[in-house]
Amino acid sequence: VINNNDNNVAELSLGLKDASGSADVLNVELYGADGKTGAQNGIDDIIFTAIETLNITSDVVSVLGNEQLTTTSESNLITDISADTALTTVNVSGNDKITLTVGAEAALLSSLDASGMTYDAVLTTSAASAVTVKLGSGNDTINFGTTLTGADTVTDGGNRTATTADRLTATISGLSTVTGTGNLNIS
């Protein structure tokens, strides 16, 4: 559990006592402070090796019971997830805004699942492998950079308004399956 309370964390090295298995899971819960920017609720780099699944929960420190990271600048922020090729799955859930980047080191990432997010998620992946992305019910953005190929798939999570549709950004060399009835804005 990471309770930022208006403090940016530089590097955070995590691991398991025994990560020798083939189905190791690391759970990270983020609790940002309401009224603070992503930089203030941020982690520059989460570093780990030999873990196949990373589960991230994005929430807010609750004092009054009604806080939420809702403004444009508010967010739980992970600037980089530095994993090795063992990482194949990242699951993101929670009810408060999150911005995260999975670094290119996670070359075998195959699933980036934010379907458990009920608020906005801004996700970036640089994985060269085929990635299946599932977005949540918020106003989500997925960035592939230059790694989007015909083998990647994106499923929208139900945010289907004309002005706040889920967004995909990439330098497109190929676009494969996009499912759902929402709008897909490509820029």
Task: Give the positions of each predicted feature.
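Solvent-exposed, low-complexity segments and loops of surface/extracellular structural proteins
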Residues: 1-187
